[in-house]
Amino acid sequence: MGQYYRCIVLKKDWKETKKPILAALSPYDFDNGAKLMEHSYVSNDYVNAFMHMVHELDTDRSGLPCVWCGDYADTFSTESLPLFKKMNTNTQKYEICGGFNAYNEAGDWMNEDGEKSDELNEVLNLIKDYNMHDYRYIINHTKKEYVKVPEYEKDKWTVHPLPILLADGNGRGGGDYHNEICINPEETNWGKRKYTKKHNAQFVGTWAYDTISVTNNEADTKGYKKIDWEDEIEF
């Protein structure tokens, strides 16, 4: 089954509040598919819109907690949204309830009575000029790291690092980022094909829920370590 993703900005106190979502976007509002590798490319509208949303909401330039959450991602406890056991009166068995799931919480934030929520419409209006901006650097304030976005190359599907770094749930559904690559694709016998782990596989999900910001100013990365992300062309 395919796994569907939503890009999400969390409130700075997201672990302590029952309403942790600051903003979220649906790929469908940008004519994109919801599977991770249907939109995780340089110059993609959905990714560009998310980066501009982060920039516009991050008014003090200290960064905001972010995640690219799939619908197969785990639900976990936070201080205000703990997991707990509840008896199912039909089965007479305890079930795990409650907890925090960013994908589900974002869905609730974006929708109101089957329509776009007022909050979502406000954000969409805030970032309506997203395609006029091209942020080149993504800074992780939690880990004191940064990554430079690869240059856009016409007619090439260059993987964008941000959705991969922020991914929660990758590897659990169709359309996810593949950690391995075939090194003898000319081999027609599938049983004889050989695979090796991609260099960028080490970064998958390592920034999920961390505090990030985006910028065009390389000077803003001073004091941060550049991660060893390799340019990767999917097609």
Residue ranges and their predicted role:
Residues 1-29:
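Short, extreme N-terminal segment that most often corresponds to the first beta-strand
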Residues 35-235:
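Low-complexity intrinsically disordered segments
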